[in-house]
Every structure is written in C-alpha cells, then in structure tokens.
C-alpha cells in the first residue's frame, strides 16, 4: 500500500519515526509532518502565511518532508501537491499521549486523519498513552497499527471514516485485547491557576486531574482497563437527533 504518514508532534518525534521505520518494511511510505511540535492544533489550517516545504533525509526507506504549518496543512499539502494521486491510506501518529474522550476535539493527530477522510482517503489516527517519567510504548503501538493496516487491506473500508486507535501504557502481555467502542467523556477535570506579574497582568496556567467519573463501554473506560481501543469517527457534526425538531422552529 501507498501510505501518507503524518502527526502533530513534529517530524523528528519518536512516535512517527518508530511507525515509519516499521511500516516502510512492508509498504511505500511518504512522511509529511510539521517542522515543529504542533500538539492540540485541532483542525486549524494556515491561511495568511506561506507554507514552507523542506525535504528531510531519514535513515530508512521513506520520502520525508517537513511542513511549516499545522497537521491538517500537512495532509492538504501532501494530497494536493506532493503525492496527489497515489495514496491508499493516511495514518496520523504515533501520538505522544492518548486521543480519547473529549480530547479528540483538540487533537492535531485526529484532525490530520480527518483531513485525509475529507479527501476521500481512508484514514487512521494512532496514539500511545503517555505517563510522566516513563518510556512511551511506541513499538507496541506500531505493531498494532501495522496489524490494523493489514486487516484493512482485506476490507472495503469506507473512505469517509477515520479509525481512532489508542494503545494503553502497559506491557504487551498485559493488554487484554481490542475493543471497538464509542467516544467517552472528558479525561481530565481542568482549571486555570492564576498569578499576577509585576505589571499587574494575570498569568493563567492550565492544570487538571484525572476525571474519575467515566462511562462504561467507552474508549476512556477500556483504556483504563488495559484494552486497545478502536473508534470509527466521522467529520459530519450534524446533530441528527434534533434536526427535524430544529426545522419545526421555522415552520410555525
């Protein structure tokens, strides 16, 4: 398969390079990723500035480019200019940290995959749980991504669907299996701490703690119970539950 590989942690991040090294043994890989760290970019794109594209050398068999823009920019530039007619699948990751629950709305990793689906290319986001002061399990995540890719080769995956794959932080032997599940609620209870600087300005810093109020059967629930989670996503944000009800407001 011809694969476009991107991320939001930057082209030198360990996660994307671990995945690129493994995938390039079995597939044709083109890496197009942000020049710098762009986590939590969501689906932002560059409008008022030029985008700089630089070719980058890698020690394994991939064609690689760094992009001065966002993760979504990377996919747009790749599919419009760099490899416009030759991509079977977009893979975004491996992200440093989970993209589950409400956090997917902020995620540059997930948004890059969604951008791929908007170009009618089947896409997948891959994320590995991050725990402070511990080594991320990128190699385990890469193996699961490759396995998922091999499974998808045999299926007629709809091109407007994004698969969101998340791997818990534990040994491979501790992983209980894979759960296909829905998106959960928030992972963290966040708040801003406040300080005042010498000029009287407020300095706000985002803080938070783990949200213990989680729902059974969701990605948040299964990750905490050491399952790999897989959730199909879609970029159509229409709330169909109240579409007809909303329409009635204008019929009276």
From Swiss-Prot:
It is found in: Cytoplasm. Gene3D superfamilies: Survival protein SurE-like phosphatase/nucleotidase. Its cofactor is a divalent metal cation. Keywords: Cytoplasm, Hydrolase, Metal-binding, Nucleotide-binding. Pfam families: SurE (PF01975). One of its GO terms (molecular function) is 3'-nucleotidase activity. It catalyses: a ribonucleoside 5'-phosphate + H2O = a ribonucleoside + phosphate. The keyword Hydrolase applies. A divalent metal cation binds at residues 8-9, 39, 95. Transmembrane segments: none annotated. It comes from the Bacteria. Binds 1 divalent metal cation per subunit. Its main location: cytoplasm. Its EC number is 3.1.3.5. The keyword Metal-binding applies. Nucleotidase that shows phosphatase activity on nucleoside 5'-monophosphates. Belongs to the SurE nucleotidase family. NCBIfam families: PRK00346.1-4, PRK13933.1, surE. This is 5'-nucleotidase SurE.
């Amino acid at each position: 398969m011809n694969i476009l590989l991107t991320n939001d942690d930057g082209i030198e991040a360990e996660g994307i390079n671990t995945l690129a090294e493994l995938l390039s043994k079995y597939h044709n890989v083109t890496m197009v990723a942000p020049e710098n760290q762009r986590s939590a970019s969501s689906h932002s794109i560059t409008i008022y500035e030029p985008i700089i594209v630089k070719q980058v050398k890698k020690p394994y068999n991939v064609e690689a480019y760094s992009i001065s823009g966002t993760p979504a920019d990377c996919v747009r530039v790749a599919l419009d200019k760099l490899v416009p007619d030759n991509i079977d699948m977009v893979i975004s990751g491996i992200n440093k940290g989970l993209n589950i629950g409400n956090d997917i709305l902020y995620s540059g990793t997930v948004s890059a995959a969604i951008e791929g689906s908007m170009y009618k290319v089947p896409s997948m986001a891959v994320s590995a749980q991050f725990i402070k002061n511990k080594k991320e399990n990128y190699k385990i995540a890469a193996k699961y991504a490759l396995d998922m890719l091999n499974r998808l080769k045999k299926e007629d995956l709809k091109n407007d669907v994004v698969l969101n794959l998340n791997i818990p932080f534990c040994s491979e032997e501790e992983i209980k299996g894979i759960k296909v599940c829905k998106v959960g609620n928030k992972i963290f209870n966040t708040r801003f701490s406040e300080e005042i600087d010498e000029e009287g300005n407020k300095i706000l810093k985002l803080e938070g703690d783990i949200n213990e109020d989680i729902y059974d059967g969701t990605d948040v629930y299964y990750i905490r119970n050491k399952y790999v989670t897989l959730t199909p996503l879609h970029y159509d944000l229409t709330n169909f539950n109240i579409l007809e009800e909303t329409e009635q407001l204008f019929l009276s």
